[in-house]
Amino acid sequence: MGNKKKTRKTVPKEFISLFRVHSGRDAPRRDTREVQKSKKHGFRFTSLPDLPVASNALQELLLEYGLLNDIKWDSKGLKASKNKKTKLKPINSFIAFRSFYSRTISNPEHQRELSSKLADVWTQESNQEVWKQYTQSYNNYLLLPDAKLNFVDWLCEALDYTIDNTTPQIEDISLTSYNQLLSGTIEDVYIMK
């Protein structure tokens, strides 16, 4: 049976990376028991940042679609919604942003319009990094065996934030002018010299 050489299996150099751990640069470690109890932040070592303040353009957009949702929505002809058991999937930061801010819009047509307008707002959004942190934590949460919450519910639970699904409060002056626009009345306008 002769002379058998034992060959060593080696890993090619392009698949090896070297790194060094510096004790002064270690992130403070969080107690893993606390993470297991709360199950809010998955593998994060620090807490999530607070919900960012919406920009003026975003506030105007949400106000417009919130009012349209309350005023023009006609639910006739719709089938009763079935509680579909959807599989929770990892998301990106724009999807998180869009789903959070469009959660109260129930009209499908308005949701489609709002989605494209939110995409325009997203390009100018200064808090994209905050939304990226939210999605990273949410995607880690999805790795847990008992993950059952969608992104909006998970974020609200993680930030101890309660959702107010009522119409946003506006000043009486702007509300009356908005109602006049929607009332269908036509006023005559005369130019006087």
UniProtKB/Swiss-Prot annotation:
Keywords: Activator, DNA-binding, Nucleus, Transcription, Transcription regulation
Compartment(s): Nucleus
Its biological purpose: Mating type proteins are sequence specific DNA-binding proteins that act as master switches in yeast differentiation by controlling gene expression in a cell type-specific fashion. Transcriptional activator that induces the transcription of alpha-specific mating genes.
Keyword Secreted on entry: no
Family, per entry: Belongs to the MATALPHA1 family.
Residues of the DNA-binding region: 86-142
Species of origin: Candida albicans (strain SC5314 / ATCC MYA-2876)
Name assigned to this protein: Mating-type-like protein ALPHA1
Keyword Transcription regulation: yes
GO cellular component: nucleus
GO-annotated biological processes: positive regulation of mating-type specific transcription, DNA-templated
